[in-house]
Amino acid sequence: DKRGEVSVVLKTDGTLENLTASVNAALSDRASMDCREAAAGTADSFYGTGGFLQVVRDDGYSRPFVGACALCDNETGNAEEFFAANFEEYFTVSEQLPTRFAFYLGGGCDYFLAALQALPGCGKNWEVSAKDKLAAVLNEYRCGKSAAESATSVFGEISCEEERDLRYRCNCSAEYLKGVLSTLGKDELESILQEQGAVKIHCRYCNKDYAFTRTDLADLLSRLGK
């Protein structure tokens, strides 16, 4: 089904205030980040000392699953270790599915993620094995191999079933945002139009600005008035 979407929200009390990312079933993704200035006289801690990670899985049928966990590792300055530790915490706490991650953030479009999940009967030492396997896969990738080649090199008994490209694409549009505005109700929209002359929206994902005049919203206001 191409209507599903997964969203991740990360909030900390450090310089990184909010990080939001989402990807749909067509592998179109978008993301935004908000940062705050460090208080005067304090050490600049990017991840702070507290916060939470939230994951929303929407199957497209208005049945979203929302899970969350407190951040467990804010001390490391290494982004790869930070994300790996906290996603592992999320899967353990919220979904009760032990998972190990390996991240590579090379800058720009050069990034890599590998994950291994425990299955019934995997044994008590699976974590050690998973850690070693992930380190080996990551090393292969850093040596110039593709993601599929890296996995096949370490897990020789498996093969890549499918390769798909991820692309950055915002799904905002005038029609989509009118649907969002409908949740404000007619009275609120009328008040904004009266005070400002237009309802203005800034998309934080693609930085596009929208301005809806009374003429633009005539049909919506008519429907809301019924």
Language model regions located:
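Interaction interfaces in information-processing and related assembly proteins
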Residues: 1-160
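Cys/His-clustered metal-coordination modules, chiefly Zn-binding fingers
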Residues: 131-226
